[in-house]
Regions:
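Membrane-embedded catalytic scaffold of the fatty acid hydroxylase/desaturase
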Residues: 83-268
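Long, highly hydrophobic alpha-helical transmembrane signal-anchor segments
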Residues: 49-90
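Select subsegments of transmembrane alpha-helices in polytopic membrane proteins
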Residues: 46-60, 146-159
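A membrane-cytosol interface segment of integral membrane proteins
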Residues: 173, 177, 259-298
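Alpha-helical membrane-inserting segments
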Residues: 20-24, 54, 58, 62-70, ...
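Residue-level signature of transmembrane alpha-helical entry/exit and packing/kink sites
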Residues: 9-14, 40, 44, 82-90, ...
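Hydrophobic transmembrane alpha-helical segments in integral membrane proteins
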Residues: 1-18
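Membrane-interface helix-loop junction between the first two transmembrane segments
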Residues: 22-44
């Protein structure tokens, strides 16, 4: 099957599932009573438009010319690997992609780096990631749903190393590996943000075999309630950094949290400017606190 047709099929599947979850959440009343505000929908629209029409094309163009300049001899030379090793390559792609993403995600949530230059980079990631955690109104009733998957402020996707890893795979000619790997991760990420509760039901199942099996699976894969706790306004916001492979949260970051209850409150507290303007919330970036980072003496 041609890579283009495979990509089209996964695009339709992803958009279809995305739309299904949004409609499902609406029918279940997940957007009522302050759970989702007008500003949340506005932010979703801005994020979607910016990602699709500005940032993603810019990433593809910039990464392609970077690779072509630095590694001109590698362009398209490894596509034949897919004929013999497609499944192992997809597994390797997902594991590497998840590790790169989890590393930066962990860095964005960590305490301020002691090295002042690392602190500047970290401040960028913290600011770029903040929008993904600011939802709902000031009443604390806001909840996340499938639409939150794509809520990211400018610069976050462009500066993620796993996105550059993906375009590098494309440059090498590993189209099918990239299509399958990114599609599987996207579908799983949408499912993790959606208001699904099956994982909590299985964790509380009366059968020990079912509950313990689900508990074990939560150490391998990320399920909705694990990611919902990452979006909570609690200490769990600094837990569960992965989108797909929970093994890294468990064995590498030591930040795995498994709960049978939903978070009490979602989202980070917002400043008055963030509460007032969706454009400020999307575009504002405190690049550098010069005094605290030690570049200048007061």
């Amino acid at each position: 099957m041609e890579s283009g047709s495979v990509n089209d099929q996964f695009t339709y599947i992803t958009l279809g599932l995305f739309g299904f979850y949004i409609i499902y959440e609406g029918l279940r009343g997940r957007y009522r009573d302050g759970r989702k505000t007008l500003k949340d929908w506005q932010i979703f629209g801005i994020s979607f438009a910016w990602l699709q029409f500005v940032e993603r094309p810019m990433l593809i163009v910039c990464s392609y010319f970077t690779y072509r300049t630095l590694m001109p001899g590698l362009e398209g030379n490894y596509g034949h690997w897919q004929d013999a090793y497609l499944v192992p390559l997809i597994v390797a792609f997902i594991l590497i992609d998840e590790l790169l993403h989890g590393s930066v995600h962990y860095f964005a949530h960590a305490k301020r780096a002691k090295n002042k230059w690392l602190a500047v980079i970290q401040r960028w990631y913290k600011g770029a990631h903040r929008l993904h955690h600011t939802n709902g109104g000031p009443d604390g009733k806001g909840q996340i749903g499938a639409s939150q998957t794509i809520v990211v402020s400018w610069g976050w996707p462009f500066s993620l190393p796993n996105y550059w890893f993906g375009t590098f795979c494309l440059y090498l000619g590993l189209w099918e590996v990239w299509i399958w790997g990114t599609s599987m991760k996207s579908l799983w990420g949408i499912h993790n943000h959606a208001n699904l509760t099956y994982d909590m039901t299985l964790l509380k199942h009366r059968s020990p075999l079912i509950s313990k099996t689900m508990y074990a699976l939560c150490h391998v894969f990320v399920f909705p309630n694990q990611h919902h706790h990452h979006h909570s306004r609690s200490s769990n916001s600094g837990k569960n950094f992965q989108n797909f492979i929970a093994l890294y949260d468990w064995l590498l970051w030591k930040k795995l949290v498994i709960s049978t209850e939903r978070p009490a409150v979602y989202g980070w507290r917002k400043s008055e400017a963030e509460e007032t303007s969706v454009l400020y919330r999307f575009f504002h970036r405190p690049f550098m606190d010069k005094w605290k980072l030690g570049f200048f003496k007061p």
